[in-house]
Amino acid sequence: RQRQMFIRDRTKADTKIKPGCIIEKIDGTNIKSGEDYYPLLSGKAGKQVLLSVYDPATKERFEEQVKPITYGTQSDLLYKRWVEQKRQMVDKLSNGKIGYVHVKGMNSESFRDTYSELLGRCREKEAVIVDTRHNGGGWLHEDLAILLSGELYAKFTPRGQFIGNDPFNRWLKPSCVLMCEDNYSNAHGFPW
C-alpha cells in the first residue's frame, strides 16, 4: 500500500496515485504480498518506470509512469519536510512571532543556510528557535555563537523613518538553542 507521497513540485503533479492505493506491478512484474519489491527498482533512479496501481476506494486499476529517486534524494526530501513541519508548528504556536531555523551540520553550507534564514525569513520575528538536533558536527560553533550574540549599538532613523540597525549581520533578539543526544562533535559542544 502507498502510505505517503512526496511531490516535489505540486504545480506539476498530475497523478491518480494517493495514500491507500496499492502498487500491483512494477514494469509489468507482479508484486506478491510480503515480497521484497526493491530489486524491481534497483538501478532505475531517474528513469521512467511503469506502475500498475489499484485504488480500493474507487475499485479502479490504472497505470502511471514515474521516476524513482535515490535513497539520498529521499533522505533530503524527508529532511526538508521535517524542517518545514517544525517551522510551521513554531509559526502556528507563536502566532507568527517566533522564527525557526534548523542547523543541519556544523559546516560552511549549513552556516550560509542558517544565516540566510535567520537574517532573511526570521529578521522581523521577535525571537528565534535555533534547532541543532540530529547534527553531525563540524567546525561552526564560534561562527554560530557570534551570529547569535549580536548587541545593538546603533539605530538609523533619519527624519523619523526607521531604516535599520547595526550590527546588521548579527541576530539581535532572543534565541533558544535546541539540542539532543545524537548531536555529534562540534554540534554537541556548541550549546554549552
What do the predicted segments below correspond to?
Residues R8-T11, G138:
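Serine-centered coil/turn micro-motif
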Residues K18-E24:
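Structural motif
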